[in-house]
Amino acid sequence: MKAAALMLVCALAARAEDVRVEPRQFSKQGRIFTSLGVTWLERSDYWLNPGLLLSATYYPTERGGPEARLFWFFSSLSDSAQRISSSTGFVPDARQPEALALIGWRQSLTYGKVAIAGTALHFDVQGAAHGGGLFTDRGIAPAFGASAGIVGRLGSHVFAQPDLGLLLSFEQRQKSTAALGFLPVFSLGVDL
């Protein structure tokens, strides 16, 4: 009986399809990754801050490399802040973000691939740390950011990159000088 069960298992295994393992296709070493994306800076300070992002990362090794990021914000007061301003003349003491320039390091944490509908999706899970300046309506404020995200290969040279980040800036305000914000980003790019 045991021999029959073993023969049945072996017969089923022999009929199984061959598993295809794709080689690593997402190589970064010696390449520059450039991207353009959309973002939103949320600081709970009465400013609505949608924006655009331009980013470039050079990978001297497969593990990571220096990165520069430029953000442009199209900020406006929220509806509640506009109502208060029009009725009382008061405006928030938070600065209006106009642009953000950051330089730092992007590190690949792990490489993976997932089979979806017969196609392999290659991706990197990454983390990044940056420093720079937040350009506002009242000058420049020092800023520091940290983010985590995924870089996924969409074609031979095209990639998508969602990032979730935090931004800490130091501004002159009534109660506090530190402003912490949430900075999600979605960008599409090409590697050169």
Listing of model-derived features with the role each one plays in the protein:
Residues 15-60:
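Short glycine/proline- and aromatic-enriched beta-strand/turn motifs that initiate or cap beta-hairpins
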Residues 22-30, 45-48, 63, 111-123, ...:
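Short loop/turn motifs that connect adjacent beta-strands in outer-membrane beta-barrel proteins
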Residues 30-32, 48-52, 97-101, 123, ...:
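Residues that define the transmembrane beta-barrel architecture of outer-membrane proteins
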Residues 34, 54, 103, 127, ...:
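Membrane-embedded beta-strands of outer-membrane beta-barrel proteins
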Residues 36-40, 52, 68-72, 107, ...:
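Transmembrane beta-barrel strands of outer-membrane/channel proteins
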Residues 57, 106-108, 115, 149-151, ...:
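Transmembrane beta-barrel domains of outer membrane proteins
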Residues 62-137, 141:
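Gram-negative (and chloroplast) outer-membrane scaffold detector with strong preference
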Residues 101-107, 179-192:
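Outer-membrane beta-barrel "beta-signal"
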